[in-house]
Amino acid sequence: MGAHHPALGLLLLLLCPAQVFSQSCVWYGECGIATGDKRYNCKYSGPPKPLPKDGYDLVQELCPGLFFDNVSLCCDIQQLQTLKSNLQLPLQFLSRCPSCFYNLMTLFCELTCSPHQSQFLNVTATEDYFDPKTQENKTNVKELEYFVGQSFANAMYNACRDVEAPSSNEKALGLLCGRDARACNATNWIEYMFNKDNGQAPFTIIPVFSDLSILGMEPMRNATKGCNESVDEVTGPCSCQDCSIVCGPKPQPPPPPMPWRIWGLDAMYVIMWVTYVAFLFVFFGALLAVWCHRRRYFVSEYTPIDSNIAFSVNSSDKGEASCCDPLGAAFDDCLRRMFTKWGAFCVRNPTCIIFFSLAFITVCSSGLVFVQVTTNPVELWSAPHSQARLEKEYFDKHFGPFFRTEQLIIQAPNTSVHIYEPYPAGADVPFGPPLNKEILHQVLDLQIAIESITASYNNETVTLQDICVAPLSPYNKNCTIMSVLNYFQNSHAVLDSQVGDDFYIYADYHTHFLYCVRAPASLNDTSLLHGPCLGTFGGPVFPWLVLGGYDDQNYNNATALVITFPVNNYYNDTERLQRAWAWEKEFISFVKNYKNPNLTISFTAERSIEDELNRESNSDVFTVIISYVVMFLYISLALGHIQSCSRLLVDSKISLGIAGILIVLSSVACSLGIFSYMGMPLTLIVIEVIPFLVLAVGVDNIFILVQTYQRDERLQEETLDQQLGRILGEVAPTMFLSSFSETSAFFFGALSSMPAVHTFSLFAGMAVLIDFLLQITCFVSLLGLDIKRQEKNHLDILCCVRGADDGQGSHASESYLFRFFKNYFAPLLLKDWLRPIVVAVFVGVLSFSVAVVNKVDIGLDQSLSMPNDSYVIDYFKSLAQYLHSGPPVYFVLEEGYNYSSRKGQNMVCGGMGCDNDSLVQQIFNAAELDTYTRVGFAPSSWIDDYFDWVSPQSSCCRLYNVTHQFCNASVMDPTCVRCRPLTPEGKQRPQGKEFMKFLPMFLSDNPNPKCGKGGHAAYGSAVNIVGDDTYIGATYFMTYHTILKTSADYTDAMKKARLIASNITETMRSKGSDYRVFPYSVFYVFYEQYLTIIDDTIFNLSVSLGSIFLVTLVVLGCELWSAVIMCITIAMILVNMFGVMWLWGISLNAVSLVNLVMSCGISVEFCSHITRAFTMSTKGSRVSRAEEALAHMGSSVFSGITLTKFGGIVVLAFAKSQIFEIFYFRMYLAMVLLGATHGLIFLPVLLSYIGPSVNKAKRHTTYERYRGTERERLLNF
């Protein structure tokens, strides 16, 4: 038997520890001070000790799994209190998912108090300690190993990895793991929590992960709860937002629309190509058929084409008048008689007419005294009752206007990338040029200098402190500065801080930066520096807002720093707003003059765009003036009809041209004055565009009137007033047609809700109407006076000086341009072989334009609105190149919603027990599809953070037990007690009056290391509490858009945000809540127009064309087909304008839409005169009538509009403003060239083919009127 004793002894030694481990401790109680107020635990190897009964509540709160039998534990009450204190930060972020926090508490409860500690804890370092209170020698536990089951660690991590931190828009583990949430895993998370360098652990705990026994140690493998499981009967599983497996399949975006293709090619190209070829086939086939048919009837091809043989496209119009012909003839005769009498009256009574005209002009233009010019971009681009404008007003009223932004984007072009080598080991980390410490010091100097800028307003000094956003004021008056330097508390000393020795640097600004970009809301980093990341203003500084040019989320690779100074905006408080303007002016001046060869700075202030728009308008005044001078000179010289050098100063009409121009400008002034009387403000687009438009319309009428007189012979026995009356009777109807068509088109265009189009249309319509009235009154009288001067041989301008009498006198003659049109251009254009070519070319161009009309870009590049030399252009470029986050977007829930009921809470919140289709959850789901929805991050949710804050397990919500006033978590006062009891009822969410009782406390609580959930900084402005803190008004839930670079991006972001909000609203309504959710971002008011720009364009152009059609139909005396042909031609011009816009890179927006509406009006000038001349012609065939119309009206249209406008437009090409060069020079040039070619080439050809038949009643009336006079011979041309 003795031989077996050694083996038996060894077996007993192996078995005995197992028996000891079953109920054995490694520590009990607290001993010496470790760091700060943290203590070591006392080493103890005995059995667990019964917990005093006054600690029962605490163990039930923290470790209910250990509350059994006589509650014998390996910890005392002080250790439990320390555990509670150390777990406050994880509690605040993880308690929203009970199963996650349950597993975490299991890990720490087993570590701190488990009666089986010795199974999985192994003390590896101790030191002696003398307790001065008990006068006993004890042993501090300085280090130990914690054997944790790998499966337990993985299960705990899996339950927590999806938990959100609503106030910081990121995963909670990103704040608790010491690294980015994406890099966090089960092992490095637990290692971080047990590392004494994290600021919470008093000593080092080395976790050892294994599911198998190691060296006789049994890993802690307690049961865990999945995030989709309930912890107890009171709490439910975690929400979808905090537990992805609860959500089911991840939502998928709808597939992008497939491009419309036919045979692998763009469908529009194919369709229009096929259509064009088919048209050519039909058109030329019809011509060939007619030609062959005519060959059967004509003896020779030289037989006159103006025969009435059947099927002739040029057949003459014989036969009886139709039923509408007499009506048209009567109406035309009525107009002719009325204008004839009026013209004669004006010539006979020039003094009276001119006096009343001047009086009218004076009265109307005096309204300019009350003129208001709108430069506010919101007023310019957003309709007062548009959805975006109303939502902006609602947001501003309830939460205050969105803050003013002063922003700098800084690069370090002369600095290279440097490499940081972490201690003691790890991969090298590259740091971008601007993250060089010397550069950071220089940027900090700049930032401090900007903070020191002062301005003067009303003899008061204005500083940044006076106007900045300070969310924790008055407790913390530091301004919000979104800058990477806020990670270093905006301090040179903190930036230079480092921990190391003579050989190594253990921690410096690199380590602090790497931690803070992962946990921007942290109050204590994990390095030896232990510095806060939270900004000095009390809020987090998110890396995507202060860094630019990095890849993915590697913030250390940043190539740009972004510094933003949010400044308070004010709702209906002009006085305080002017203070901000004054400071911004000094800010702009300072940064413009700042010199540092190591830094490249792009910047903007809130007022920058408005300032630059004003500067742009002023800088291009000279260009616009030159443009008008060129047109004035041309008009003044071209009106004269010089017959000989000796009569140069007599026959010139410079004074008449100047008078005509002044009449045009007076009509503009009258229009501005009339609407200024009404209190309607002007816009820059009105001032810049309308004179151009009215000059085109007015000059054309002047040329028609003057040139008709110059070609006219005075009849026998006819006086001057009778002659001018007769001439006005002939041409005034066509002037009336064009002017009234344009006036109607513009006034109907004012139905548009777009402010730019609405205002322009009203002012333009009134200006054109007044211009017409002044031309048939004042100008006719002036023309009569000028003719009398000419007949008396007096010099132009110097009208009192009589010229030499050469005996020639003035007589009617044809100008060179008229003879060119009559003898060469018109006959050539209407040749049988050329007309088909003209039709083919113009229809081809039309087909191309239709094919590309859907490819015109929509929007307005912001940089185009700035002068070429503007500093804001550099800012826009840097914005697109470097920034990685878009503007903030607020989902606003309108006032009246019931947050105090469980049902109401569930429809909004995103935590445990909340609906899977709640407001927060739907925004969270949208952020998961950020490339589609353009929502970049999960929303910050005040209600979820409030529930965590008010939870009885948290140390955040406490009251003084005597006064019942709020007690901040940082206050160490034994009279402070938790707000709600630690009972099953207390653990439930507050409802009813209790919900409102603690909410104001939450919104006024500043975050601190003991409670990071204080809502003052994050939610102080997010919740309206009204009715003396009795109920909640409007609230918002904020997130950020993804980076937006183009107009299409901005428009799509707004569209998707509205879709999300609409879905939330519909979901709430389906559950009985009739309150609306809408999104708001600062740019919505500017980009809303692009959501409907296509519909607005179709509406405005259709209304304009429709009104032109109706006026033309009436004025031409029910000539239906003439009105149709004219509108077809104008429509072709408009479609071709879209083709030019696509070719020339002109986008569709409010500015280009105004120009399109204007081009519709100017097209009338090119088409209406020739169309009416065609209908009035009594020639025998369509070709002859088209030739006569083109010869007589073409020269006036060409000289009156085309040449006048062309000279002025060319000058605009030299404008400094990009918006002038693109939207005015390019579009004006296009509309003049397209109008001229269609009006002078295509329209006559079209009329020669399908023009209306001659009005028999008009022909009869005309013959009867001129029978027996010398004008009878002119009827046959």
Curated annotation (Swiss-Prot):
Belongs to the patched family. InterPro entries: HMGCR/SNAP/NPC1-like_SSD, NPC1-like, NPC1_MLD, NPC1_N, SSD. It is linked to Defects in Npc1 cause a lysosomal storage disorder characterized by accumulation of cholesterol in lysosomes and impaired cholesterol homeostasis. Causes age-dependent loss of Purkinje cells, loss of body weight and leads then to ataxia and premature death at a median age of 72 days. PROSITE patterns: SSD (PS50156). Keywords: Cholesterol metabolism, Disulfide bond, Endosome, Glycoprotein, Lipid metabolism, Lipid transport, Lysosome, Membrane, Signal, Steroid metabolism, Sterol metabolism, Transmembrane, Transmembrane helix, Transport. Changing residue 378 to A: No effect on affinity for NPC2. The record marks 108 as: Important for cholesterol binding. It comes from the Eukaryota. Detected in liver (at protein level). Ubiquitous. Detected in adult heart, spleen, lung, liver, skeletal muscle, kidney, testis. Cholesterol binds at residues 41, 79. It is a multi-pass membrane protein. A cysteine-rich N-terminal domain and a C-terminal domain containing a di-leucine motif necessary for lysosomal targeting are critical for mobilization of cholesterol from lysosomes. Disulfide bonds join 25-74, 31-42, 63-109, 75-113, 97-238, 100-160, 177-184, 227-243, 240-247, 468-479, 516-533, 909-914, 956-1011, 957-979, 967-976. One of its GO terms (biological process) is macroautophagy. SUPFAM superfamilies: Multidrug efflux transporter AcrB transmembrane domain. This is NPC intracellular cholesterol transporter 1. N-glycosylated. It catalyses: cholesterol(in) = cholesterol(out). It holds the Pfam family Sterol-sensing. Residues 175-205 are annotated as: Important for cholesterol binding and cholesterol transfer from NPC1 to liposomes. It is found in: Late endosome membrane; Lysosome membrane. The keyword Protein biosynthesis does not apply.
